Amino acid sequence: MGSVSSRGHRAEAQVVMMGLDSAGKTTLLYRLKGYQLVETLPTVGFNVEPLEEPGHVSLTLWDVGGQSQLRASWKDHLEGTDILVYVLDSTDEARLPEAVAELREVLDDPSVASVPLLVLANKQEVPQALSLPEIRDRLGLQGFLGRSWDLRACSALTGAGLPEALESLRSLLKSCSLCMAR
């Protein structure tokens, strides 16, 4: 993977999406690409898609499989990451401790020490979904001193919150002077 770089007049950034299985990473990936809702299967390995919009940094989105047997390889995808997106199933309160533990393990990796974090609280269309303040507190996001982060509500199913998530991603990228200097 690369990092933010300039090729001619274009800048590119590597975005890695991680999260537990069934959090909605692949559906989010294809919705961000502008596709209508697509049926997905559990990701074995990873999916990679470019996201280019005129006037913006070109993004390469890496959707890394979240099944427990694949998580050991997550660290293999971190080198050269410019933004880490952690997708959380807001309706799966039973697996929240597991999601928190996996996120902390990823963030402990030295290769992402200064990489901004965007947490996408997916499945917000479900009435029982955890609220953003509850997710923020349970993930301990306020304790991530020295790291730029944002938390956004979204729904891969309906597309709600995805434009705001993309804008947040771009804002985090712009604010990351270390990323731009790489």
UniProtKB/Swiss-Prot annotation:
SUPFAM superfamilies: P-loop containing nucleoside triphosphate hydrolases. A lipid is attached at residue 2 (N-myristoyl glycine). It holds the Pfam family Arf. GO terms for cellular component: cytoplasm; plasma membrane. GO terms for biological process: intracellular protein transport; vesicle-mediated transport. It comes from the Eukaryota. This is ADP-ribosylation factor-like protein 11. It comes from Bos taurus (Bovine).
